[in-house]
Amino acid sequence: QAALAGLPRGVVTGGAPGRGVILDGATTTACQIVLRADFPVSASERDGARALRLEPLPTRLTWEDVPEGTWAVGGDAAAPVTLPAHTSVLVAGPPGSGRSTALRALAQAMASDPLVVDDLDLADIATATQVEAALARSEVVLASASTEKVATTFRGAISTMREREALVVLWPGMRPADQAAGISLRTVTDPRAMTLPGRGALVYRGTCLPIQIVLPRPEDNDRPIEHPV
């Protein structure tokens, strides 16, 4: 790709977020863009530079396998994923991808008491209005909807969450995931796990991270969750 762009040899800077090249017509300078403090990264990537080692994402992960407060693992190190405090999350995915399980995992990981709405795309007017009001007050909202609905809704609570908050796209290799995310998800899609329940991508402020949702702990009198729903 660098050669196709006309870049000379020796200026390839790697694929880390923010890496780039400054071209002024005479010289070529490798550079690193200063990233925002709330740029989403996995825990190990946040700890500092180290030798690159790509860890495969697990195909199944329970709350007993991860540190307290972990709702997903992701990134090159398959490490616990974090988001800035007070961030709302919209979970998009087709039936069977694990939307409801993702909401439950997110809710258990939150320090606050968020408003949780499963199937926001099927909610009545009163519920949708409640979500919009909560977002306007900067309260944390966790909601889910079908990928198709997220991709084709341009106003209301779903549109607001897609544009302003974090988006979890389950089964990112399935149509119309790219349209729902507003960016191509090809680089975070594992062709061997296209329909693995709980497999997805975290999209936040123009960046994306491959993730696997953690199966949350059972609530009182609940059976353990064996598979994402």
Please annotate each region the language model reported.
Residues 1-86, 152-229:
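Phosphate-binding and hydrolysis-coupling loops of NTP-dependent motor/remodeling domains
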Residues 91:
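Hydrophobic anchor at the beta1->P-loop junction of P-loop NTPases
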Residues 95:
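The conserved Walker
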Residues 98:
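Conserved glycine(s) of the Walker
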Residues 102:
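Hydrophobic positions on the alpha1 helix immediately C-terminal to the Walker A/P-loop
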Residues 105:
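Active-site signature of alpha/beta-hydrolase-fold catalytic machinery across serine-
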Residues 112-128, 140-146:
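Conserved P-loop NTPase "ATPase switch" module shared by AAA+ and STAND
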Residues 124-137, 155-158:
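Conserved Walker B catalytic segment
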